[in-house]
Amino acid sequence: MVHLRRTTSPYWWPIPRKAGGVWAVRPSPGPHSLAYSIPLALVIRDVLRYAKTLREARMIISRGYIKVDGVVRRNYKFPVGLMDVVEIVPTGEIYRVVPDERSYYALVPITSEEADLKLLRVEGKTAVKGGRLQVHFHDGRNLIMPAETARQIKTFDSVLYDLKARTVRSHIPMRLGVYAVVTHGGNVGFHGQLSEIVWTLKRRQSVVLLKRGEEAKRTILDYIMAVGAEAPVIKISP
């Protein structure tokens, strides 16, 4: 695997660039890309500050004390990204990774009732055998659904997924009036009602306008996620 220098790591990682050594932990291949993920070791050491050194963070992780989306992760390089649920098993603390205007991504504490819930954005669909469709989500997850159900779910829509039951609880279409949050780009973390979509030949580059009170922000369709019909269905901000 190619090494990763601190100076070339994603700018929002909470690590010093010119101190602490030359190299940073490079996320292993997984559900999120390098640009939009942070290694589990840095979550434990630099974000939550449960460890002072990488050695301590690796020890905590290797002992099975950390769950991501309800699964024990022992790989300290595991990539943690948007909407992932991080649980500290010994303390019972649970956090969700959400877009944040100050730190790009932030971990916000959530209740145990929300721990099994995760918002997933639809990235595409593929036809499979048996007349069914496979729906692809932003975190690398794939679900095979009956064609009638999957046809109602469009690219850019969101679903509220039950991690424990492994089922879709609800469907949130990407349409005017929906409540959405900016997940990437210069306006990351801003959330509000989707009031305008200017469609372009490249759908992902379509310009959208989000409004919250008197404040409004423009970005592209590829940079937003629907999080509720009129209000967020889960906690999305600190």
Curated annotation (Swiss-Prot):
GO annotation terms (biological process): translation
Superkingdom of origin organism: Archaea
S4 RNA-binding domain ranges (all copies): 38-109
Keyword Ribonucleoprotein found: yes
Keyword terms, alphabetized: Ribonucleoprotein, Ribosomal protein, RNA-binding, rRNA-binding
UniProt xrefs under SMART domains: S4
Listed Pfam families: Ribosomal_S4e (PF00900), RS4NT (PF08071), S4 (PF01479)
PROSITE patterns with a match to the protein in the record: S4
SUPFAM superfamilies, alphabetized: Alpha-L RNA-binding motif
InterPro entries: Ribosomal_eS4 (IPR000876), Ribosomal_eS4_central_region (IPR013845), Ribosomal_eS4_central_sf (IPR038237), Ribosomal_eS4_N (IPR013843), S4_RNA-bd (IPR002942), S4_RNA-bd_sf (IPR036986)
Cellular compartments per GO CC: cytosolic small ribosomal subunit
GO molecular function, one term: structural constituent of ribosome
Entry-linked HAMAP family: Ribosomal_eS4
Family recorded in the similarity comment: Belongs to the eukaryotic ribosomal protein eS4 family.
Record's protein name: Small ribosomal subunit protein eS4
Organism per entry: Pyrobaculum neutrophilum (strain DSM 2338 / JCM 9278 / NBRC 100436 / V24Sta) (Thermoproteus neutrophilus)
